[in-house]
UniProtKB/Swiss-Prot annotation:
EC number: 2.1.1.242
Species of origin: Vibrio atlanticus (strain LGP32) (Vibrio splendidus (strain Mel32))
Signal sequence annotation: none
Cellular compartments annotated: Cytoplasm
Primary localization: cytoplasm
Family: Belongs to the methyltransferase superfamily. RsmJ family.
Protein name: Ribosomal RNA small subunit methyltransferase J
Pfam entry (one): SAM_MT
GO molecular function: rRNA (guanine-N2-)-methyltransferase activity
Amino acid sequence: MQLQLICEDATQIDHLNDLATRWNLSHDENSDFALVLTCERLELRKVDEPKLGAIFVDLVGGAVGHRRKFGGGKGQAIAKAAGLNKGATPTILDGTAGLGRDAFVLASLGCKVQMVERHPVVAALLDDGLQRAQKDPDIGGWVSERMKLIHASSHDALDKLSNDPNFEQPDVVYLDPMYPHPENKKKSALVKKEMRVFQSLVGADLDADGLFEPAMKLATKRVVVKRPDYAAWLDEQKPSMAIETKKNRFDVYVKASMT
């Protein structure tokens, strides 16, 4: 993956070089995207649209922190979909981790969550946010214990895991593929900004249907797929049930009882 690699803190140039090596990133001064290491964090900027601001992972404050404190606990839709309302605390594999928000919610409710993010730039942002969260005095302990990023940014990561006899299968596989976004649908300013930047960097998950089969193979108890309310079922597979919210729904494919 080629994009601008910029270090704003001269003391961290070696760290940026390590990141580039780890995530197979190379510098391209003509790219519209810049991955910038500041003195505080790693962030993504769209150089030709500076008004969009920077995208970075913040699991401590902002909207994510607010949701952790006031988001409704095990009664919220994502928790019900994952089976937490059954009294279980399942192990979860988030196969489309993105900026880690949903994984963080599930981890804050007690679940051990392994995350796969196949795009190297997004994975680098998530890894940076995780490392900062691990140092936070309030949440660092359980973030370190419950959230793990699997360094597999290839498109066949789920396939590889499902065929790996040494990989411990999770109770639940959670998927939230990026869906092409109709212009007439309202989104919050933050989500709009992120979707615009991500869809131009990553593109919609046009091969998302291919995630369904390995997800079903991996999960021991259920697969949960988050979809916009207007979207079709993943891979045209009818779910066992759906939990609907105002703008989204969680399609649940049950394989076995949670208890």
